[in-house]
């Protein structure tokens, strides 16, 4: 082939370099809205029903923490043993929820609560012992060296 003809063909299909427009790459972002729609459609097929008047939901984890949902929306399908919770979950320690959560605790959670109470009492004893030692050390006044009188040095 002729070199001039080849150069003209290359110039017409030039992709990059000086003087060529930039090509924008189209990026497709997958939104979470599509996932929510799929989930809603699946739940609708399972014939879930809303459950009213649920004030809070607590899920107990193995490490002793609790996932707490305040005023969630709850849907359930009893025949398929499926429950859906909608809301913002917060991870909290068991001690933060203790007064109102005692009637919800099962045997496993009660055991972890006992362990937590024992460790808390031990921490209190250790702190009290350490505070007592610090007070004794601060109250100690160093003894004066025999034969020295500091009052005479002041004058």
Curated annotation (Swiss-Prot):
It comes from the Eukaryota. Residues 1-35, 116-155 are annotated as: Disordered. The keyword Oxidoreductase does not apply. It is found in: Cytoplasm; Nucleus. It holds the Pfam family NAC. PROSITE patterns: NAC_AB. Gene3D superfamilies: Nascent polypeptide-associated complex domain (2.20.70.30). Keywords: Cytoplasm, Nucleus, Protein transport, Repressor, Transcription, Transcription regulation, Transport. One of its GO terms (cellular component) is nucleus. InterPro entries: BTF3, NAC_A/B_dom_sf, Nas_poly-pep-assoc_cplx_dom. One of its GO terms (biological process) is protein transport. Residues 136-155 have a biased composition (Acidic residues). Residues 33-98 form the NAC-A/B domain. Its main location: cytoplasm. Residues 20-30 have a biased composition (Basic residues). CDD domains: NAC_BTF3. Component of the nascent polypeptide-associated complex (NAC), a dynamic component of the ribosomal exit tunnel, protecting the emerging polypeptides from interaction with other cytoplasmic proteins to ensure appropriate nascent protein targeting. The NAC complex also promotes mitochondrial protein import by enhancing productive ribosome interactions with the outer mitochondrial membrane and blocks the inappropriate interaction of ribosomes translating non-secretory nascent polypeptides with translocation sites in the membrane of the endoplasmic reticulum. Belongs to the NAC-beta family. Part of the nascent polypeptide-associated complex (NAC), consisting of egd2 and egd1. NAC associates with ribosomes via egd1. This is Nascent polypeptide-associated complex subunit beta. It comes from Aspergillus niger (strain ATCC MYA-4892 / CBS 513.88 / FGSC A1513).
């Amino acid at each position: 082939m002729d070199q001039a003809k080849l150069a003209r063909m290359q110039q017409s299909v030039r992709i990059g370099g000086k003087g060529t427009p930039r090509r924008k790459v189209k990026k497709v972002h997958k939104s979470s809205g599509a996932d929510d729609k799929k989930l809603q459609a699946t739940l609708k097929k399972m014939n879930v029903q809303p459950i009213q008047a649920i004030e809070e939901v607590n899920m107990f984890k193995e490490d002793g923490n609790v996932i707490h949902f305040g005023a969630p929306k709850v849907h359930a399908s009893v025949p398929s043993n499926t429950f859906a919770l909608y809301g913002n979950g917060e991870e909290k320690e068991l001690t933060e929820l203790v007064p109102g959560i005692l009637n919800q605790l099962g045997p496993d959670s009660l055991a972890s609560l006992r362990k937590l109470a024992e460790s808390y009492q031990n921490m209190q004893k250790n702190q009290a012992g350490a505070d007592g030692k610090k007070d004794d050390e601060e109250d100690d006044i160093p003894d004066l060296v025999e034969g020295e009188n500091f009052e005479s040095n002041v004058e």
